[in-house]
Amino acid sequence: MSIMKKTISALLICLMMAGINAQQISESTENVPENTKTTPLQYAELIQTDDALFRVVHFLCLQTTSVCLADKEPATRAEAAIYLNAIKTEKLDATGQRLYEQAHRYLHKQNYLLKNDYLTFDINGEFALYGQYSDAKKMLLADQLSHYNKTPAPVAVPLTINLSPYVNLATYLEIKKGFWASQLSLPFTNMPLKMEALDVHIPHVANISIANSFMSFTIGRGRHNIGQTLNGSLFLANSTHSLDFASLRFFHKSVNIASSIYIMERYRYLFTHEVHFKITDYVGVRLFEGTTQYGSFDLRYLNPMMVIHNIYGWDEGKVNGLTPNGSQFGIGLEVVPYRGLRFYGQFEMNQFQTAYERKNYPAESALIPNSLGGLCGIEYAHSFPACTLTFQSEFLYANPWLNILENKKISLLDKHTEKVKPQNTPDEYAAWLTNPIGPDTIAFTSKIGVDSFFRYGASLQYRFLVQGENGEKFFASSGDIYYPTTPDEASIKTPSGNPLFVHTLSIEGFDEVYKNLTLRAGFEVSVFTGRKKQTAFHTYAGIEYKIR
């Protein structure tokens, strides 16, 4: 432990010195609006997952026929500024220029309660009152989690402290419902009106972060997402609302390198490293590798330049009778061949038995399933004077064993325990870390939306989904092991067993009717056929207000 503390302390000192000596991003005035050139950038302050800024930078990149590298959320203001400043403003139309200036003002926040050369402090009050109804018990797990994550707390107090531009401490305190209480509506608002409905595990967002103009290091918790998709990322998806992590990143306008560790629950870790880079302005590639670990913390997996697979952690003995390591490998590709048009794809794999393995180890390899999945999509965004119009379609395939590994301890699954909850509800709930819809699935999704990003927006989405039984069997099984015991089980195809067919239509929108006062509403209906015949509804309407 003392070695770990010394390592982190040395890293903090190095980053501080590098930050002081590095050229400040805000001092490079190329492509920077005049009204933000004199405003220092708080390098280390985090921009949280699903913030509008990520959508703005993504749209501006599409408009300039460029791949967007700012798609790993959350991110520091320094990282976001690198990719915003890299946008070729001469290619932007009037709408793009306006959004570009808005994004810069947003990044160079000025309205701190306390601000001087070495310290900034800010605290705010956020309030939300929602009316809602949900047939949560009938819905897919992914939809339950999505609705919960999108519902704001009735009372929240975000707090941030910047100790110089290079060190940030932040937390998001809130009074809100727990997950199981939200599934019961109790009674049809977002307010926890009973003690059993109160979420006592706050804060779900908290961090300490240090950063300069080219690197950052963060220890914290919150939601995470990698890549702009409709059905959820195959690298790391935002389905889980509170994931503890530590992450080291290096960023440049043409490349982003990250090495991270995520804690799924005590003694369960996910180590990842990745590189996301541009081959040309309009072609981008992401290489992603990870390993799940059960047991003691292993420093070997923190090495960003090591091929994790070649450590062979699963071959080093069992922990409590269980294989201690699982694997994850991913490749992403994006092409922006024309203004506003993007083609993209993601591939994820946990296991794949090669011809060599099947020939030389036939008995063992016959019991190991090929667990893999992929998605591909097309997106087109067009700007109008007052807003943007976006159309996106996506196809997803996940075979029956994607993210289900030799035992549940190393499967790519995040677990949460609720100490306070309504009676007759489970103690815990789970969320897939990637592919939120789950394994054994084929899905097609289309979405059309209008967006001004900072003021109003609306979208209409349709999803058709076919899902086999293997994901449900995984959750329903007892014990720590759910894995093939016969070659027939290892070779099942999607959709396995008696399939489920789901048609889902959703519409939602928001409008900032007055400064800091926003109205939101949405409606969703899912029609189930196949092994279940039912209809599920989810609807909400609410008002949100921020003091500042």
Residue locations for each model-derived region?
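Outer-membrane beta-barrel "beta-signal"
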Residues: V275, Q534-R548
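Cleavable N-terminal export/targeting peptides
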Residues: M1-D50, R55-V57, L69, P74-R105, ...
